[in-house]
Amino acid sequence: MNISNKKIILHDMCLRDGMHAKRHQISLAEMTQLATALDDAGVPLIEVTHGDGLGGNSVNYGFAAHSDEEYLSTVIPLMKQAKISALLLPGIGTVDHLRMAHELGVSTIRVAAQCTEADVTEQHISLSRQLGLDTVGFLMMAHMLEPKALLEQAKLMESYGANCIYCTDSAGYMLQDDVFERISVLRDGLKPDTQIGFHGHHNLALGVANSLTAVEAGAERIDGSAAGLGAGAGNTPLEVFNAVATRMGASTDVDVFKLMAAAEEIVVPMMDQAIRVDRDSLVLGYAGVYSSFLLHAKRAAEKYGVPSEAILLKLGQMKTVGGQEDMIEDVAINLAKSR
């Protein structure tokens, strides 16, 4: 593998994907402390919203400690060099949420959809570009589509105005060959000036390896979280990826040791439980289950007295996707009845 002299844009997920691991209960003080540390380390992009994106505060997805407006208005004025991004899932977030984020100073909007449903993003991607924002099409659960079919969905997002397309391994299911094939096809099939990104989860302990493979295949943006704070077994641990990529001769412009310090001294003490590859998160990666289902499944398992891994395996067999959180309890009830 040769990634020497490649320029990589790192994007930290602690304050968005990390919300899942914190049951969306990150305080404003914690958010401020971590965001300023990441900014000081040179991380160029930091995502800040509810775990399920703008408008995610709900019974279905969980109520955060604060509103998106409070989080964004607290963090954005403190940034010296980092830009703040926000995730938006059509059907959860609306164009009004998008406008609110723009007015508060968000620089990047990432419009996310199930990898087969890019057509639902047209309104939001188009508006984001009209507002002059860095606009990302975020294709979730990308393992569920073959590379050429994924490219067709990516081309739709590109046609709506997205200047960057993400291959998103929401389940932490992909192996390195899966990543290489998809990123290569996207790089070859999209416009040369359309950037490619990769978002990994560490459910099979492949977050770093898959992200390096993505860079080798042509990805320029890489998502991760300091100390891996995120759904499932966490996102690609950003401080580890940064150290490895730097050793391999790539350029991130992120201070290796300051990012390590942010992970060790700020993120780890924030954790409600250790972010690691345990049995349940390994099942997520093995069965291809949406990573943010993990804590929902654990709660349903406790409530109905059934093994959480049985719930997750069934969800994988059903090929459930993000947005179907209500089915987790249905599966648990049916498993309890069948015992």
Swiss-Prot record:
The keyword Lyase applies. It catalyses: (S)-4-hydroxy-2-oxopentanoate = acetaldehyde + pyruvate. Mn(2+) binds at residues 17, 199, 201. Gene3D superfamilies: 1.10.8.60, Aldolase class I. Keywords: Aromatic hydrocarbons catabolism, Lyase, Manganese, Metal-binding. Substrate binds at residues 16-17, 170, 199, 290. The record marks 16 as: Transition state stabilizer. Disulfide bonds: none annotated. Residues 8-260 form the Pyruvate carboxyltransferase domain. The keyword Phosphoprotein does not apply. InterPro entries: 2-IPM_HCS-like (IPR050073), 4OH_2_O-val_aldolase (IPR017629), Aldolase_TIM (IPR013785), DmpG_comm (IPR012425), DRE_TIM_HOA (IPR035685), PYR_CT (IPR000891). Its EC number is 4.1.3.39. GO terms for molecular function: 2-isopropylmalate synthase activity; 4-hydroxy-2-oxovalerate aldolase activity; manganese ion binding. One of its GO terms (biological process) is catabolic process. It comes from the Bacteria. The active site is at residue 20. NCBIfam families: 4OH_2_O_val_ald, PRK08195.1. HAMAP family: HOA. PANTHER family: 2-ISOPROPYLMALATE SYNTHASE 1, CHLOROPLASTIC-RELATED, HOMOCITRATE SYNTHASE-RELATED. Belongs to the 4-hydroxy-2-oxovalerate aldolase family. This is 4-hydroxy-2-oxovalerate aldolase. It comes from Shewanella woodyi (strain ATCC 51908 / MS32).
